[in-house]
Amino acid sequence: LTSIPLDLHLMIKDPEYKFQWIGIQETDIVSIHYESTFQVQRALDYLQPFGCKRFLAINPATPVYVLEEVLDYIDGINLLMVNPGFAGQKIVPSTMKKAEKVMHLLKEMHHEEVVVEVDGNISYENAAKLRKIGASIFVAGSSSVFRGDVCGYGNNIKKLRFLKVEQKNIDD
């Protein structure tokens, strides 16, 4: 399809049986939801031969402790800041505290190499707060980059860059 690395967020049931249909590349990030399968570790294992970065997505209501048993299987966590389904939602207030809990868990369990991606209502203000907490990948959408008209997209990207939101290298 493309040589550009993709960030694939799979919101599908039993994703482990569908990976071969997608065309996953070594440079891709693939996020599966904790709730999408009864066999989370197996699903993450099935991703390993593709050589991609394996991320686990957790919804706002998913407790942080579910990460404890999968940290050895993942390269990153996709922390949803809104309930999945549609653009334009406001951030779920408890997710800022949840981001702090995730960072604390990673440190406590000696897994600081696991990166945290945040998705949902990533406004300029929220991106700055989440960067301070420790998030390193930001899914920018209608709250930042795609605000306003098409001519303004470049300026919106510059505004995010101005926040000095730097992506941690996940290849280390």
Model-derived segments and spans:
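Alpha-helix-loop-beta-strand connector modules within alpha/beta enzyme cores
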Residues: L1-L8, Y46-F55, N59, T95-V116, ...
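N-terminal active-site wall of soluble small-molecule enzyme domains
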Residues: L1-Y46
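Hydrophobic faces of well-ordered beta-strands that scaffold small-molecule active sites
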Residues: L6-L10, D28-I32, R54-I58, I77-L79, ...
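Active-site beta-loop-alpha junctions enriched in small/polar residues
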Residues: M11-P15, E35, N59-A61, V82, ...
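Catalytic cores of alpha/beta
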Residues: E16-I24, A61-I74, G120-F138
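Glycine-rich phosphate-binding active-site loops on the catalytic face of alpha/beta enzymes
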Residues: V30-Q39, N78-K90, I133-N156
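Glycine/Thr-rich beta-alpha phosphate-binding loop at enzyme active sites
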Residues: P60, V70-H111, D149-G152, N156
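Alpha/beta catalytic cores of nucleotide-metabolism and tRNA/nucleoside-modifying enzymes
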Residues: H104, E108-V118, S123-D172
